[in-house]
From Swiss-Prot:
Domain of life the protein comes from: Eukaryota
GO BP: any one term: killing of cells of another organism
Signal peptide: 1-29
Name of this protein: Defensin-like protein 100
Major site of localization recorded for this protein: secreted
Organism of origin: Arabidopsis thaliana
Length: 87
């Protein structure tokens, strides 16, 4: 019984370690460019991908985050890479 429990712990530890080591490392960049509100009627990611700044900067994703002040809707922030890579 004791060896079965030890074997289970060892196998679980190996599985956890392998999943951490084999998981892809992602660099998301910076998501701090505000672009209005996230609502059920508007997709934040699609809005950010379509939007281009005056400087010509493009975005690859959009994230909804809580606002600084209480609100019904969350805020949409666009994600971008800087010229060096991910910020």
């Amino acid at each position: 019984m004791r060896s079965l429990r030890l074997r289970t712990v060892v196998v679980a530890t190996i599985v956890v370690c392998l999943s951490v080591l084999l998981s892809p490392t992602e660099v998301d960049g910076s998501c701090d460019f505000p672009l209005g509100a996230c609502t059920p009627f508007r997709d934040c990611k699609e809005s950010c991908i379509k939007f281009k700044t005056r400087a010509g900067q493009t975005f690859f994703d959009g994230k909804c985050r809580p606002r600084d002040r209480p609100s019904v809707w969350t805020a949409c922030f666009c994600c971008y890479y800087d010229s060096i890579g991910a910020q």
